[in-house]
Amino acid sequence: MALARRLCWCSAKIAGSSKPFASAPCSLPSRRNVCSSPSMRQSCMSAWAIGQYGTNEVLRYSEEIPVPTVSSPSDVMIKVHATSLNPLDVLMRGGYGAKLLKLRRDPLSVMDSGCEFPLVLGRDVSGEVVDCGSEVTHFAPGDEVWAAVPPWKQGSLAEYVTLTEYEVSHKPELLSHTEAASIPYVASTAVSALVNAGGLCRDTSSDKRVLITGGSGGVGTFSIQLLKAWGAHVTVTCSQNAEGLVRGLGADEVVDYTAGDVAEQLGTMEKFDLILDNIGGDTEQQAMGLLKPWAGAKYITLVTPLLLNTDSMGLLDGAVNAGFTLHTKAIQPPGPFVHGSIQLVSLARFSCSSHTLSGLLWTCHFPLGDHSAIEPSSVKLLVSTE
């Protein structure tokens, strides 16, 4: 069954500026030519980046961002043909996960204030390999690839991005770079949640009842199609104006959260085998009473307490508090589920997938260096470097 994905909802206003960044407080690593072609020998590139955390005003277009290096034998350097914006980019611009992500980038500089800047945003990339490490075996210069960029790495709103070969896949030939750039991050998140955490696949999803909260977003819309292709029964919560979208993607039942108490509406339905929560907050407590009382019932949330806790409490206290929170929820399910096993899975990492999709729709894309403002809209913004 061919899968089609409507683009995720991302409201963002980019205030274009070419004001240069202040010098970074930490030294840059030694550089080498990015590839053998003389035209590619450069030390700086164009990119959208931030020099501090804040609102839209901190996002700037610069032509003086250091070109990423191939510093590991397994590295692959990609010339970006297209990228896109995700809600995570907006959160990271404001400092979400800053402490833990800084630790992941460089444990030795975790106490150095501002060492992560300039920080390039962007989690999706579709482009062409221009350079490879000495041990790379699956890719060669000229290969067309796509990838989801981990949040602790420099992003793809730039001319180049460097990843390990294990984070990259060959781009499906039937997709253009613009189409391909709309998929990797939300698709990887959905697959990680449903397959790795939820244990679902083509052979295990038939007749399973799945609830997706916030189902009109990027992860939700991809999950709907994947689950329907596998034969699951899918219920979605969303606003009334998104009902047509999710039904068009295959949702069996839709609950309008603007039409009354969501828990009350869901309480009249048959209980669920799996709940994928894209919202968090009070949704968690509501969801626990909606699971079937059997050992395989699972509640999966994409709203991890780890990053929020480390931001507010510091690395050590935040990590301990998050671990205690997850442990308590996992071993003490409420109400009639005391005799069952309900798993609370908090996804803080995402693994790449190369599922082939077709029939993509997009409504807005613009060149990397376009400084014109993008007004808030219900689209996924696609950025082309071509």
Language model segments and positions:
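N-terminal mitochondrial targeting presequences
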Residues: 26-45
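Terminal helix/beta-alpha structural elements that buttress the NAD(P)+-binding lobe
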Residues: 3-5, 39-72, 79-132, 137-386
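Acidic, Ala/Val/Gly-enriched low-complexity intrinsically disordered segments
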Residues: 12-15, 22, 34, 379, ...
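General secretory precursor processing signal
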Residues: 11-13, 29, 38, 367
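Cysteine-centered motifs
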Residues: 8-10, 26, 35, 352, ...
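N-terminal chloroplast transit peptides
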Residues: 1-27
